[in-house]
């Protein structure tokens, strides 16, 4: 019996150690990088892809930068690349091209050579978007160095300050007599005074006279219409 208890204790202890080792181990191990012969140095591999464009048309001017310019790699004719002699750590891998833009990728290398890749997000640093390894970096589109020339439209013509300065006074002259009661003498005097304040140059025609003539024409027409209606009414009687 004591031997059986000892065996059970040893079995339980082994199970506990196994559970602890499993909890501290990596549940999702990444791919192992190719180790170099000169110590704990590894190789970052991947491929750059530009949809619809031949690699020969843009790879000659493109470079692979690891952590700025600490490590520099070049692209092959098929778009693949390999950056050698990289120690373990966390690095930002980006492809620099004057023709196309690529999203940077962060690669984490453990001391055992396991690789993990994720997108770099400078705004939401806590957000992790896993990427496959070896890297498959696609171009986001061509660079835009110049702004598109704006085309001419009717709104540009109507919103021109010179056009507005010419059109607005005409609208005021045409619509104001229809809105304001021109038969009121006090209202007419106030309008004449306000228009004279806007006309300080004596060489220009007097605005008050123009407004008086304009209102007098409207009042004479209304008076003539009233007289005509009255005469028609007397004739009917």
From Swiss-Prot:
UniProt record, GO biological process: protein insertion into ER membrane by stop-transfer membrane-anchor sequence; tail-anchored membrane protein insertion into ER membrane
CC annotations in GO: EMC complex; endoplasmic reticulum membrane; membrane
Pfam families: EMC7_beta-sandw (PF09430)
Main location: endoplasmic reticulum
Protein location: Endoplasmic reticulum membrane
Residue ranges of the TM segments: 157-177
Record's bilayer topology term: Single-pass type I membrane protein
InterPro entries linked to this entry: Carb-bd-like_fold, EMC7, EMC7_beta_sandwich
Top-rank taxon, per record: Eukaryota
GO function terms (MF aspect): carbohydrate binding
Cytoplasmic side of membrane: 178-237
Signal peptide: 1-23
Stretch list, region Disordered: 215-237
Keywords: Endoplasmic reticulum, Membrane, Signal, Transmembrane, Transmembrane helix
Residues in the Lumenal compartment per record: 24-156
Family named by the database record: Belongs to the EMC7 family.
PANTHER family per UniProt: ER MEMBRANE PROTEIN COMPLEX SUBUNIT 7 (PTHR13605:SF4)
Known function: Part of the endoplasmic reticulum membrane protein complex (EMC) that enables the energy-independent insertion into endoplasmic reticulum membranes of newly synthesized membrane proteins. Preferentially accommodates proteins with transmembrane domains that are weakly hydrophobic or contain destabilizing features such as charged and aromatic residues. Involved in the cotranslational insertion of multi-pass membrane proteins in which stop-transfer membrane-anchor sequences become ER membrane spanning helices.
Subunit annotation: Component of the ER membrane protein complex (EMC).
This protein's name: Endoplasmic reticulum membrane protein complex subunit 7
């Amino acid at each position: 019996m004591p031997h059986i208890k000892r065996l059970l204790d040893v079995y339980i202890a082994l199970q506990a150690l196994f559970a602890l080792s499993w909890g501290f181990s990596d549940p999702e191990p990444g791919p192992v990088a190719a180790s170099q012969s000169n110590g704990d140095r590894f190789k970052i591999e991947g491929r750059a892809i530009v949809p619809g464009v031949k690699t020969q048309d843009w790879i000659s001017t493109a470079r692979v930068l690891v952590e700025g310019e600490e490590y520099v790699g070049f692209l092959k004719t098929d778009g693949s690349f390999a950056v050698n002699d990289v120690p373990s750590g966390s690095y930002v891998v980006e492809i620099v091209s004057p023709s196309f833009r690529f999203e940077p990728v962060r690669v984490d290398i453990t001391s055992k050579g396991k690789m993990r890749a994720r997108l770099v997000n400078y705004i939401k640093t806590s957000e992790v978007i896993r990427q496959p390894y070896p890297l498959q970096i696609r171009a986001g589109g061509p660079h835009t160095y110049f702004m598109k020339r704006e085309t001419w439209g009717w709104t540009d013509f109507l919103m021109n300050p010179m056009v507005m300065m010419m059109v607005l006074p005409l609208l005021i002259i045409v619509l104001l007599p229809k809105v304001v009661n021109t038969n009121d003498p006090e209202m007419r005097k106030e309008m004449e005074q306000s228009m004279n304040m806007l006309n300080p140059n004596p060489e220009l025609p007097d605005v008050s006279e123009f407004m008086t003539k304009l209102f007098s024409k409207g009042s004479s027409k209304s008076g003539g219409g009233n007289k005509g209606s009255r005469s028609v009414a007397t004739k009917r009687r």
